[in-house]
Swiss-Prot record:
Stated role: This protein is involved in the repair of mismatches in DNA. It is possible that it carries out the mismatch recognition step. This protein has a weak ATPase activity.
One matching Pfam family: MutS_V
Keywords linked to the UniProt accession: ATP-binding, DNA damage, DNA repair, DNA-binding, Nucleotide-binding
Protein name: DNA mismatch repair protein MutS
Length: 826
């Protein structure tokens, strides 16, 4: 609240704070950005900055020179930051009673980073906007750092949540009405992601406003030409997001691309639970570790290629044509090791073309950024020149003919810019001397002023014949030419008299005045000239913006294929047959992550052979630690790799495309929703039963173990039967279980086959062979595993005694009655 005693400067602060709202306001005051009141306390607590007071008002400050690092720290903690800039310089305001002009100029939020150490180089940084119209959810997804804009719609909450979790945004935008009505959606998302929730006005999500906002931005009268016809919820989300960025956060939006929809593209769907369970992006128990599939496959050299690999890993293809195109391209490079080496070297010189273009579009680029663009364009063009003469596979054909404007731009940047460039324009030394005649003259004048004066003095001595003529300098006159009074009449008419002395006359010339002007203002002139030249160069770059972004996509695709071919070459992967058949046959398959973590040749390969008309359900029994879980995960990972267009670690493989992968592996309590481990297990299994199809792959590990023996067995068998006999749900299923009773199903159903994780006994001790063989397991060796885990020997001994009782002659059934089991414990 302002008061009568509030200073004019603090009135400015209150006006800015009102606009900043919930954001933490950094208010420029000379060489510091200051925070006041509660903002000052928050700043002090989170950045370890001294908290002081001015007239009883809490305040803390950050030096202007270090502002970006502090903003990054605040944003990483989930804060939104508003920055009020000083519009006048202090010297310009000297003698005036009113304060310097200040206004709120920008906001920084987790989802709107443009230039920050927080931006992950090889991952997108998304902000998403969601709303609902009728039964449909609309999702708009924007990577503000690249301008990539995606729209999608969903008819159920689960698919929406899965997609948001796949995208892993850092910020979500919606209106109060949506948040209140769909708190469950936000809760589900927050279980998997750390993100910031942002709220915007309800009216911004109205269709008329959203349509108008998008149409104005993209300069069209209709959005139908973008393939958005009928996508009302998605358009509403997109229009609100654009307005939020431009109108509320005051951010530049010129770089935001025309929104794309998934359209007819088909992808293998991997739900959130499966992404986590299969450790596609992040290891479950070691988030910084090396046991994710992404870590194994990551061989890319460019940020764009890295982002493409990451996105494709969680969104593989369900389109044979797209898969085969990439397989052919991988094979093409796989057979050419020298070409791969050459391309790798060139790609390592390519920086982030997408984000560099965004920085230029939004006027945030500095000279070093333009230098990186120059080097990246040169290397990218060289990549195209290397590949274009070759007999290319279809995936690459027609993609390396570069527009004349792009090659001309590359040549211009190489001619215009110096080799080493500064971070800021104000540091100067950006352009080559010959880029502009005034630049060369000013620099030469500055660097050779004494030499120039001496040469000029000698020149006019020779021209006039006055050998004692001198070029001098004084504070009052500046530079002047002095001759004795006797020789003054000999000087040409263009010499301009400045001063008469007792025995001497002082003159100047236009050339000397020009030199003086240059010397007096040379630094300012140089900075002004280079600033203007820099702006002109950025404008020329932006004329080729779309061509640069197209080249960026080409480089990303090459980098992606090269990464897959390097991986295949390093581990001797095979090319799988991927088609529309119902086959899932892999010979000598190896877990791609385990292969890299273990010594070479120590991982035991295993096979699988499934078909919808023959075996489509495999029951796997065997002791813990024998490799059951590794095996079933392995099959899912190999399918994912194959449908990315990658080769896979196996001797051979024939994979009929899978439309969805579901996993029910492990569990933990979900305390935030009051769900026990067993409830989480049942919820995930229910999702599988509702959403699996005949072309899905289902991975089940120990379903039913979280309850009583009979309950668990009943649930497990019912799930198996449902997936075996329900039309439209006959998915290929790998079921690891300790329920030996389930293995009897093989005798009654031709589509079920038993396998087991093999174990050899040596002196009464099990030796795990890690082979998956036909037939069911005879023993579980659970007590041995307990012993390895460090159980007290007395507990192990008692367990062995109880086991002998249960397995003795008095046990007349395969499964003991629960009452009998209880009696043996006392």
């Amino acid at each position: 609240m302002t008061s009568k005693k509030t200073t004019p400067m603090m009135k400015q602060w209150h006006q800015c704070k009102e606009k900043a709202g919930e954001s933490l306001l950094l208010f420029r005051m000379g060489d510091f950005y200051e925070a006041f009141y509660d903002d000052a306390i928050v700043l002090s607590q989170n950045l370890d900055i001294t908290l002081t007071q001015r007239q009883g008002i809490p305040m803390s400050g950050i030096p202007v020179s270090t502002i970006n690092g502090y903003i990054d720290r605040l944003v990483s903690k989930g804060f939104k930051v508003a920055v009020a800039e000083q519009l006048d310089e202090a010297q310009d305001n000297k003698g005036k009673s009113e304060p310097l002009s200040r206004e709120l100029q920008r906001f920084i939020t987790p989802g709107t980073l443009l230039s920050s150490s927080l931006l992950p180089e090889k991952a997108n940084n998304y902000i998403v906007s969601i709303n609902r119209v009728g039964a449909l959810f609309g999702l708009a997804c924007l990577d503000f750092s690249t301008g990539s804009f995606l729209l999608q719609e969903y008819d159920n909450m689960k698919d929406l949540v899965d997609e948001i979790c796949r995208l892993a945004p850092t910020e979500i935008l919606s209106c109060d009405k949506f948040y209140k009505k769909h708190a469950d959606i936000i809760e589900q998302i927050q279980q998997h992601l750390k993100l910031t929730l942002s709220t915007y006005a309800d009216w911004a999500f109205e269709h008329q406003f959203a349509t108008q906002k998008l149409s104005l931005h993209f300069h069209v009268s209709s959005l139908d030409g973008f393939g958005l016809k009928g996508l009302v919820p998605a358009i509403n989300s997109a229009g609100a997001l654009l307005s939020y960025l431009q109108d509320k956060l005051l951010l530049p939006v010129e770089h935001i691309s025309i929104p794309k929809t998934q359209g007819n593209q088909k992808h293998l769907l991997i739900d959130t639970a499966s992404q986590v369970n299969l450790e596609l992006l992040t290891p479950i128990h070691d988030p910084q570790g090396k046991s994710s599939l992404l870590h194994v496959m990551e061989r890319t050299s460019t940020p764009m290629g890295g982002r493409l690999l990451r996105n494709t890993l969680v969104n593989p293809f369900y389109d044979q044509k797209e898969i085969l195109l990439r397989q052919d391209a991988v094979e093409f490079l796989l057979d050419r090791s020298e070409l791969r080496k050459n391309l790798k070297s060139l790609l390592s010189q390519v920086r982030d073309l997408e984000r560099l273009t965004t920085k230029i579009t939004t006027s945030l680029a500095g000279p070093k950024d333009i230098g990186m663009l120059r080097d990246s364009l040169n290397a990218s063009i060289r990549v195209c020149e290397v590949l274009s003469p070759l007999p290319l596979p279809k995936f690459f054909q027609g993609r390396f003919t570069l527009p004349i404007g792009l090659t001309s731009l590359s040549e211009l940047l190489s001619r215009a810019l110096l080799g080493e460039l500064p971070l800021r324009i104000s540091e100067g030394n950006i352009f080559c001397d010959n880029h502009h005649p005034d630049l060369q003259r000013l620099r030469y004048t500055k660097e050779h002023s004494k030499e120039w004066l001496w040469q000029y003095q000698e020149t006019i001595r020779q021209q006039t014949g006055v050998k004692k003529l001198k070029v001098c300098y004084s504070q009052a006159l500046g530079y002047y030419i002095e001759v004795s009074s006797d020789f003054a009449p000999l000087l040409p008419k263009e010499f301009i008299r400045r001063q008469s002395r007792l025995h001497a006359e002082r003159f100047t010339t236009e050339k000397l005045q020009e030199f003086q002007d240059d010397m007096l203002n040379i630094s300012d002139k140089l900075q002004t000239l280079e600033t203007q030249l820099f702006k002109d160069l950025c404008a020329q770059i932006l004329q080729q913006r779309e061509e640069i972004l197209s080249l960026s996509q080409v480089i990303a695709d090459i980098d992606y294929i090269l990464s897959l071919s390097d991986l295949a070459a390093e581990y001797n992967y095979c090319r799988p047959i991927v088609d529309t058949s119902d086959s899932l046959s892999i010979s000598g398959g190896i877990h791609p992550v385990a292969q890299t973590l273990l010594d070479k040749g120590t991982f035991i390969p295993n096979d699988i052979k499934m078909h919808s008309t023959r075996t489509r359900m495999i029951l796997i029994t065997g002791p813990n630690m024998a490799g059951k879980s590794t095996y079933i995960r392995q099959i899912a990972l190999l399918v994912i790799m194959a449908q990315m267009g990658s080769f896979i670690p196996a001797k051979s493989a024939h994979i009929g495309m899978i439309d969805k992968i579901f996993t029910r592996i492990g569990a933990g309590d979900n305390l935030s929703k009051g769900m026990s481990t067993f409830m989480v297990e049942m919820a995930e299994t229910a999702n599988i039963l509702h959403n699996a199809t005949d072309r899905s792959l289902v991975i089940l590990d120990e379903v039913g173990r979280g309850t009583s023996t009979y309950d668990g067995l009943a649930i497990a068998q019912s799930v198996v039967e449902y997936l075996l006999f329900t039309e439209g749900k006959k998915a290929k299923t790998l079921f690891a279980t300790h329920y030996k009773e389930l293995t009897d199903l093989e005798n009654h159903c031709p589509h079920v086959e038993n396998f087991h994780a093999s174990v050899k006994e040596n002196g009464g001790q099990p030796v795990f062979l890690y082979e998956i063989l036909k037939g069911h397991s005879q023993k579980s060796f659970g007590i041995h595993v307990a012993k390895l885990a460090g159980f007290p020997l007395c507990v192990i001994s008692r367990a062995q005694q109880i086991l002998r009782q249960l397995e003795g002659p008095e046990a007349t059934s395969k499964q003991p009655q629960e009452k009998e089991l209880q009696l043996t414990l006392f």
